[in-house]
């Protein structure tokens, strides 16, 4: 419908602090890289017919068969949701928080990270079109 639609999206000011992409793997559906003390935004889609796994410190996000599962740390409840695989997933990483936006803005989750997330390594498999933007 063309009516009003509520959606969760990162604030527009985020675009103003986004730098040039840091990491663009070539023809690869997997990558591993340190955050190197840099808050960042990950933007990617699920590779068709493949499971996705994103590991951020002790937090693991998986997607398979149009289902999104986030297994957080620190005693937080796990998150399970339908996933629209045609929409990109945006993950914003800061020192102590992980924010996940999916389904064209109809899904949002904020999770507390274990320790200083920016000292950790990100690992992702099963993604396509991965872009990593530093946030200044």
Question: Language-model segments: what does each one mean?
Answer:
Residues 1-136:
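Beta-rich accessory regions
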């Amino acid at each position: 419908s063309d009516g009003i639609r509520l959606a969760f999206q990162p604030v527009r000011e985020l675009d103003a602090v986004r730098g040039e992409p840091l990491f663009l793997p070539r023809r690869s559906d997997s990558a591993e890289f340190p955050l190197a003390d840099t808050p960042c935004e990950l933007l990617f889609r699920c590779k068709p017919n493949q499971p996705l796994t994103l590991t951020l410190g002790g937090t693991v996000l998986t997607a398979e068969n149009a289902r999104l599962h986030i297994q957080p740390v620190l005693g937080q409840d796990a998150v399970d949701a339908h996933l629209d695989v045609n929409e990109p997933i945006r993950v914003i990483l800061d020192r102590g928080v992980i924010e996940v936006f999916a389904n064209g803005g109809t899904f949002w989750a904020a999770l507390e990270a274990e320790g200083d997330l920016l000292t950790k390594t990100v690992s992702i498999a099963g993604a396509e079109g991965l872009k990593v933007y530093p946030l200044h």
